[in-house]
From Swiss-Prot:
Belongs to the universal ribosomal protein uL16 family. Part of the 50S ribosomal subunit. Gene3D superfamilies: Ribosomal protein L10e/L16 (3.90.1170.10). GO terms for molecular function: rRNA binding; structural constituent of ribosome. Disulfide bonds: none annotated. GO terms for biological process: mitochondrial translation. Keywords: Chloroplast, Plastid, Ribonucleoprotein, Ribosomal protein. GO terms for cellular component: chloroplast; mitochondrial large ribosomal subunit. It comes from the Eukaryota. NCBIfam families: rplP_bact. This is Large ribosomal subunit protein uL16c. Its main location: plastid.
Length: 136
């Protein structure tokens, strides 16, 4: 199921800039294997969910998966063929702002070959280049 915040303080947000590297969420905390972002990007809730589903499908019953990013930024879209002005568009979907170094998914309880394949399948769903990371 697509994730988005239950409630937010404001309906709309500025786009902002993605400068520098990730200073938080860049170490493996829960699992043994992880997928790490190498470039900055907005990752949509759909992409996060697609990656999670791909990993759980491949790992079957074995292993545990942690999703380390959450889509908390609303992206507004204006209706097509609308003239300029008359305010900002309405929130259409949610994204997670990801900087280089950020851990996207973590996994444990499976062999390294299974984890590597599952994480590579999830990586193919991501809009950015990523790398497979192991603790230790």
């Amino acid at each position: 199921m697509l994730s988005n915040p239950k409630r937010t303080r404001f309906r709309k947000q500025h786009r902002g800039r993605m400068r520098g590297i990730s200073c938080r969420g860049n170490h493996i905390s829960f699992g043994r294997y992880a997928l790490q972002a190498l470039e900055p990007a907005w990752i949509t809730a759909r992409q996060i969910e697609a990656g999670r589903r791909a990993m759980t499908r491949y790992a079957r019953r074995g292993g545990k998966i942690w999703v380390r990013i959450f889509p908390d930024k609303p992206v507004t879209v204006r209706p097509t063929e609308t003239r300029m002005g008359s305010g900002k568009g309405s929130p259409e979907y949610w994204v997670s702002v990801v900087k280089p170094g950020r851990i996207l998914y973590e996994m444990s309880g499976v062999s390294e070959t299974v984890a590597r394949t599952a994480i590579l399948i999830a990586a193919s769903k991501m809009p950015i280049p990523t790398q497979f990371v192991i603790t230790g």
